[in-house]
Amino acid sequence: AKLRIRSVYLKQIFEVGVPAGIQSTVINISNAMLQSSVNSFGSIAMAGYTASNNIFGFLYVSVNSFTQACMSFTSQNYGVKKLKRMDRVLIDCMILSVVVTLILGSSVYIFGPELLHIYSNQADVIKYGMEIFSYTTVTYFLCGLMDLFPGALRGMGYSTVPMILSIIGTVGVRIIWIYGLFPTHRSLGFLFISYP
């Protein structure tokens, strides 16, 4: 067998990969808009956001692992036409994601001051970080659910629909919140209602 690029597989890779890449890029742009809004509160708020965001990075890895598992097992079962198993995979991943995220999110909130203290000793930085946690740790399980459905669809080879839904659902809502509602209620807590 010769090593060569097979156009049929290359097409499939692009059909799944390009929309996923576009989605990731657009979500990162909306995160930059969120960061810009946080920056308007000054350097202490920026430091609190940066510290809390670093901690959320660890939480997101845990949440995203269920999305990756769902995508992998869905694609395997889709390939062998075991469609009932695909439903079971999605339901199990949803339950596990919600349970793990609620436990980890609660832990992050409970131990938030200690975790934020790793990044800064300043009381105001910790205060801002905890304000962000108070709005985001409770609802972070939604992040897992929002990622699971697109992950399952990608596992079946559909990537454009999840991209459109994520851009409208996550980015669209966040942009409307940041530029439409946030200017009338300028507080860090109100800003983070748009998250995740």
Feature roles, as predicted:
Residues 1-18, 74-139, 181-196:
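Short alpha-helical transmembrane segments in multi-pass integral membrane proteins
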Residues 9-16, 38-57, 124-130, 158, ...:
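Interfacial/gating helices of multi-pass transporter permease domains
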Residues 48-112, 143-165, 177:
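Small-residue-rich hydrophobic transmembrane alpha-helices
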Residues 20, 24, 32, 36, ...:
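Transmembrane alpha-helix boundary and packing residues in multipass membrane permease domains
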Residues 2-33, 37-38, 58-62, 66, ...:
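Hydrophobic faces of transmembrane alpha-helices in multi-pass small-molecule transporters and flippases
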Residues 25-54, 58, 76, 114-123, ...:
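Helix-terminus/linker motif at the lipid-water interface of multi-pass membrane proteins
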Residues 28, 109-110, 118, 141, ...:
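Conserved catalytic core of Hanks-type protein kinase domains
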Residues 172-182:
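Transmembrane alpha-helical segments of integral membrane proteins
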